[in-house]
């Protein structure tokens, strides 16, 4: 077994973030007598995604991201009389209820754990929120550690973040480590900067970029144990595996 130190992203790799996000938005909007329409939801996604990209590129701070996303949304919609920072705090609290996992996350982690792999979660999320979600997910018995960017002072894809993580994993060896995640810009790019192999969870059948060294590509966590435990390089993907 070449890889026995498995580094897994949280959102949209292990955890169903779109579901958690939607439920949290609906609840928070409802608490303020507002309705989350599909168009408002889409607008928020655009604003939030753009801010997270800026955060990954060190163009803004985490505090700026969290304090401005709803301010931008309300300003665009012409909504007044709501404290956007307080609204964000309420949203993060509600987001903490989102413990639904991705398909085959439980089975995958259990298989790898029972085979002797050491599993670690690497996430850019907000620490208190992520830990609540993970604690309620049922996944934590399989993991040896969780590294949240907020607690390290760095974020994926920065090499400093991975250096922080690697220094805290006993007997860490880059040759034995595999980074698994859905995000090309944070997980796969981060693995490149850190000098570890990467497995891309390609959930939406995207074309892989030529500039990133992706060792493996999967469309479902169901396929990950075959790569790690049996050295599979490729396999037939069935529609029901996603």
Predicted regions and their residues:
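Short glycine/serine/threonine/alanine-rich loop segments
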Residues: 34, 117, 196
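Asp-based, Mg2+/Mn2+-dependent phosphohydrolase catalytic module
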Residues: 1-6, 19, 110-113, 126-242
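Conserved phosphate-coupling serine/threonine residues in phosphotransfer and NTP-handling enzymes
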Residues: 123
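Short, conserved structural micro-motifs that define repeat-unit consensus positions
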Residues: 113-119
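N-terminal helical cap/lid subdomain that shapes the substrate entry/recognition surface
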Residues: 2-103, 113
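A short acidic, amphipathic alpha-helical/loop segment
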Residues: 104-108
């Amino acid at each position: 077994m070449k890889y026995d130190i498995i580094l897994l992203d949280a959102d949209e790799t292990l955890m169903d973030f779109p579901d958690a996000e939607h439920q949290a938005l609906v609840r928070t909007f409802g608490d303020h007598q507002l309705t989350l329409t599909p168009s408002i939801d889409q607008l928020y996604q655009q604003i939030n995604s753009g801010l997270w990209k800026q955060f990954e590129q060190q163009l803004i701070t985490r505090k700026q991201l969290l304090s401005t996303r709803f301010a931008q949304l309300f300003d665009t919609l012409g909504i007044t009389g709501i404290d956007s920072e307080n609204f964000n705090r309420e949203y993060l609290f509600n987001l903490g209820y989102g413990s639904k996992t991705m398909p085959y996350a439980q089975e995958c982690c259990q298989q790898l754990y029972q085979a002797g792999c050491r599993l670690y979660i690497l996430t850019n999320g907000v620490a208190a929120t992520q830990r609540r979600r993970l604690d309620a997910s049922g996944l934590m018995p399989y993991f040896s550690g969780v590294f949240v960017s907020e607690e390290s002072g760095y974020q994926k894809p920065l090499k400093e973040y991975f250096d922080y993580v690697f220094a805290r994993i006993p007997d860490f060896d880059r040759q034995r480590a595999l980074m698994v995640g859905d995000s090309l810009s944070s997980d796969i790019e981060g693995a490149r900067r850190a000098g570890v192999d990467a497995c891309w969870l390609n959930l939406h059948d995207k074309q892989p970029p030529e500039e990133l060294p992706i060792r493996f590509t999967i469309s479902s966590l169901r396929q990950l144990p075959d790569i790690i435990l049996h050295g599979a390089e490729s396999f037939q993907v069935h529609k029901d595996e996603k």
